[in-house]
Swiss-Prot record:
Membrane-related topology note: Multi-pass membrane protein
One GO BP annotation of this record: sodium ion transport
Domain of life of the organism encoding this protein: Bacteria
TM region positions: 57-77, 127-147, 163-183, 270-290, 297-317, 322-342, 358-378, 381-401
Its biological purpose: NQR complex catalyzes the reduction of ubiquinone-1 to ubiquinol by two successive reactions, coupled with the transport of Na(+) ions from the cytoplasm to the periplasm. NqrA to NqrE are probably involved in the second step, the conversion of ubisemiquinone to ubiquinol.
Enzyme Commission numbers on file: 7.2.1.1
Annotated family: Belongs to the NqrB/RnfD family.
Catalysed reactions listed for this entry: a ubiquinone + n Na(+)(in) + NADH + H(+) = a ubiquinol + n Na(+)(out) + NAD(+)
Disulfide bonds: none
Gene Ontology terms for molecular function: FMN binding; oxidoreductase activity, acting on NAD(P)H, quinone or similar compound as acceptor
Location within or outside the cell: Cell inner membrane
Residue positions, PTM FMN phosphoryl threonine: 236
Protein name according to UniProt: Na(+)-translocating NADH-quinone reductase subunit B
Amino acid sequence: MGLKHLIEKLEPHFTHGGKLEKYYPLYEAAATIFYTPGQVTRGAAHVRDAIDLKRMMILVWFAVFPAMFWGMYNVGLQTIPALHKLYGTEQLQQVIANNWHYSVAQWLGVSFSADAGWLSMMTLGAVFFLPIYITVFIVGGFWEVLFAIVRKHEINEGFFVTSILFALIVPPTLPLWQAALGISFGVVIAKEIFGGTGRNFLNPALAGRAFLFFAYPAQISGDLVWTAADGFSGATPLSQWASGGGEALVNVATGIPVSWMDAFLGNIPGSIGEVSTLMILIGGAIILFGRVASWRIVAGVMIGMIATATLFNVIGSDTNPMFSMPWYWHLVLGGFAFGMMFMATDPVSASFTDKGKWSYGVLIGVMCVLIRVVNPAYPEGMMLAILFANLFAPLFDYLVVQANIKRRKSRG
């Protein structure tokens, strides 16, 4: 019996009048993973395309894999030296025994020696990242399925993207219950309340992170959360620049100064998926060439960031080191690159019109640098900049449409 035949045999049980009718969204979600729905348009004019919402979301999901895998490796790369800086051999064994992450990693064969290999670092990072991602995926999927069953519509695959994006923009040390709470806020409050996929005006992943930032700031900001070593305190390079300028950039665990190339490659502490600009750009290129993301938004963000950073460089300041940060450092520090490629380009919460996309992107770039520089107490400005621009996206589209209407009327 072929798979397609099995799916067709099960279909009557889930369609109207079947015993499992109320669970049709679950059947439809599973069936369309393997086969395109057999729906046709009712009108004569229609457009045929090989890509649909499911495949678009899966493309974005795969596009973040380079940043995800590097992020897992980097968690181990930052954690093991930090543990050796804090503890001797006997103390380290006791710490490993008292921490379930370390215990699981050791059971999987991870070496905690100072010369541990890349596989040990990758595995250790996976032990921190995968529980967060699995928690977020299950909880986010639960809300998606629940709302689909209650509203009697198909399950949208948006939670595939929302879940992995959310898991990649939080620290590796985030408690699992807070991860569940954050994704619940993002999916329910920022998306489903407004009608679900395609109707939300805020990015759900960023809304969930913003909720955690204001509700539980100690677990998602500060110096204690970015390196997954018990008792270790180390600021991110962005925070270091905010307090002491470019000369203050140093890897706290190793004492080695942080170069621009270190930041570009991702050899720095930070949120799991935001550290490697190189991997982010590789994934971003995939969704740009796949036409899932708009190059106009990306270009607008870069233009706004470069112009604003250059302006602050020219103005200068004797008291605020952030005025001196060049645009190419803004690009590789914090969540700028990840936000630009994967958050700002969200086709639902961004502007729809071509001219609106330019304005939307420029606003994000300007606001990110403005928040970073003018408010050094909160050096990471990309999250708030994108959420702020989400609110203005409908206005940009409205102004573009009204301008087109006036122009056409003036033609006679």
